[in-house]
UniProtKB/Swiss-Prot annotation:
There is a cross-link at residues 3-7 (2'-cysteinyl-6'-hydroxytryptophan sulfoxide (Trp-Cys)). There is a cross-link at residues 2-8 (Cyclopeptide (Ala-Pro)). The gene is PHA3. Keywords: Thioether bond, Toxin. Residues 1, 9-23 form a propeptide. Belongs to the MSDIN fungal toxin family. This is Phallacidin proprotein 1.
């Protein structure tokens, strides 16, 4: 999501987790 980009500190980690969860 775009709101994750606002927090690069955990953007990558959260993005990976969400990507795996969504799919």
């Amino acid at each position: 999501p775009a709101w994750l980009v606002d927090c690069p500190c955990v953007g990558d980690d959260v993005n990976r987790l969400l990507t795996r969860g969504e799919r």
